[in-house]
């Protein structure tokens, strides 16, 4: 199968561990991915992010793994990861230095690509720090794409230029398999919802073999690790994040410490219904049915007893294979609210004689055919998700 036929899935070290990585940690993560159902669910890439090398290249011009962190070298790490039925990923940067100040691949693309291939790398995350002001961003990403292909090894190219120069317009053309479309995610509600809001109108450029990457998941981090910031997310907020990543059809790269991940978050990221939506073969983006404001009480202002916080009501509809649909409602406001939506806005006018037969993904409850409108009550910072089929309206 060609690379990235469906959104890539895996685990990346950065969100939790940052520079605190070593061989023992990577082996433990590989063991857990293989033994706790992640591999079977589709999480196949184990990726080491920044801070794995020495601060300077060797005399032969090649990047050298830090012998204190990886005493047996990267080939041994790759071999162990492969022995668990997983694929091995590494990190480099299009600049002269990585984001953490280690050697970047600028002007070393072909030698670095061959080094990665010799070690058995299957996935390269390619960052954008310390890029020369005179450099051509598109040209350097194309150069690394060519360098990877010149090795003869199949290596998934994960381009990470933070959304610079509208990557959705050219990353497919230069051979990337996924492209970061925003700055770094942080472990809080505002960060991940801002990312989604910035990308909803751009997802039609994402699809088979070249996916919009909304960054690694923070689900289950609970404020621990390298990207913790502000208030710790609730279960409902983490569920909202994971559902959005699945619904948007973007790569699912876990970032939490799998050794201490709470059971409810493991179950969430292994939920077969959600993963089936993410991995749907047609790779269609969701259609934006509604994106505006919820109506919530405003007791502090007698002149305006109701508030309408902007960009807080979302209704999204995603077409799936076999004439199935995923219907998503979200309330991003700070108060419980009803999210209203007319079926006509989903392409189902009353005169059509067709209703939407709905089943709640979270509870399993079959709600039956819905027509005219459907207006669920949703808690603050939470969502509802339904799998639906079209049925004749016999009323």
Functional labels for PLM-detected ranges:
Residues 7-12, 44-48, 88-90, 124-126, ...:
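Hydrophobic faces of well-ordered beta-strands that scaffold small-molecule active sites
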Residues 108-111, 139, 149, 154-257:
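Glycan-recognition surfaces
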Residues 240-306:
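Catalytic cores of secreted or luminal carbohydrate-active enzymes
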Residues 369-395:
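C-terminal beta-strand-rich structural cap/linker in extracellular carbohydrate-active enzymes
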Residues 245-248, 253-255, 305-350:
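Carbohydrate-binding surface patches
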Residues 25, 29-134:
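Aromatic-lined carbohydrate-binding/catalytic grooves of carbohydrate-active enzymes
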Residues 11, 46, 81, 157, ...:
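Conserved, mostly hydrophobic/aromatic
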Residues 345-363:
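Solvent-exposed beta-hairpin/edge-strand motifs
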